[in-house]
């Protein structure tokens, strides 16, 4: 069984349903697999579930640390991973992957593919942060290979490249043959932006283009090491 279903949202209004689906949904999936004697479950989590620490460099050995830098999405993915580990303790074979920001074909109105929509519209700014990125095909291929293998009770970071948002946004713009974003969206500017978007939301049903969580996470420098998956797969 491959379990990749989850809500990815940084909007306050989505938190209750995100906690319910991401955590309870995974618990239900684990219970069903145990009840039906499923051979193995492959769970696609996220690098967000690794948490945040002061080093800004992460491997699979990092321990979760509760702090203000963890988004609610990250918390739900961490807790959903715990449901997988519960299943392992109860006799279920399982493997977990932790992809970085996934890029590839998809619905531009959802999750990380909104990058394409934003840049295509003529985004003038780029965040100053850095993060791990990966092609959706690498994500799918890795979980298939790991789930079919004899590997169990392990987790793997799936990141092709640690890149700045500046590079990613400019590459996307170049592919569209449109002007590249040239202005830095500093943490200070983003703090103003998410508050402004919050005020606009009071008078409109439109989703804010930036939230408190996305403003802060996009300013962070996060480096993810992929040595384990490269060496073992």
What is each PLM-predicted segment?
Residues 90-133:
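NAD(P)-dependent short-chain dehydrogenase/reductase
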Residues 1-24:
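NAD(P)H-binding glycine-rich loop region in Rossmannoid oxidoreductase-like domains
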Residues 24-72:
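Conserved Rossmann-fold NAD(P)-dependent oxidoreductase catalytic core, especially the SDR/UDP-sugar
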Residues 34, 68-96:
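Active-site Tyr-X1-5-Lys
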Residues 28, 79, 110-111, 127-147, ...:
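Substrate-positioning beta->alpha
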Residues 17-28, 75-76, 134:
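Glycine-rich NAD(P)-binding loop of the Rossmann-fold in SDR/ketoreductase-type enzymes
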Residues 1-2, 42, 97, 158:
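Hydrophobic structural elements of the Rossmann-like NAD(P)H-binding subdomain
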Residues 142-209, 226, 231:
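Mid/C-terminal beta-alpha module of Rossmann-like enzyme folds, strongest
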């Amino acid at each position: 069984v491959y379990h990749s279903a989850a809500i990815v949202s940084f909007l306050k209004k989505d938190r209750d349903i995100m906690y319910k689906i991401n955590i309870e949904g995974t618990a239900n999936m684990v219970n069903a697999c145990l009840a039906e004697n499923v051979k193995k479950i492959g769970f696609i989590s996220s690098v967000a579930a690794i948490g945040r620490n002061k080093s800004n460099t992460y491997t699979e050995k990092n321990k979760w640390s509760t702090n203000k830098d963890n988004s609610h999405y990250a918390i739900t993915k961490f807790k959903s991973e715990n449901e997988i580990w519960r299943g392992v303790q109860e006799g279920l074979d399982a493997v977990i992957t932790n992809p970085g920001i996934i890029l590839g074909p998809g619905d531009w109105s959802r999750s990380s593919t909104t990058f394409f929509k934003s840049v295509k519209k003529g985004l003038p700014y780029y965040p100053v942060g850095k993060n791990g990125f990966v092609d959706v095909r690498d994500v799918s291929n890795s979980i298939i290979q790991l789930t079919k293998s004899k590997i169990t009770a392990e987790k793997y970071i799936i990141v092709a490249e640690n890149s700045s948002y500046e590079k990613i946004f400019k590459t996307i713009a170049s592919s569209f043959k449109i002007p590249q974003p040239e202005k830095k969206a500093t943490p200070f500017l983003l703090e103003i932006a998410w508050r402004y978007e919050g005020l606009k939301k009071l008078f409109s049903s439109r989703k804010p283009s930036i939230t408190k969580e996305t403003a802060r996470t996009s300013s962070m420098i996060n480096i993810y090491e992929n040595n384990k998956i490269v060496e073992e797969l």
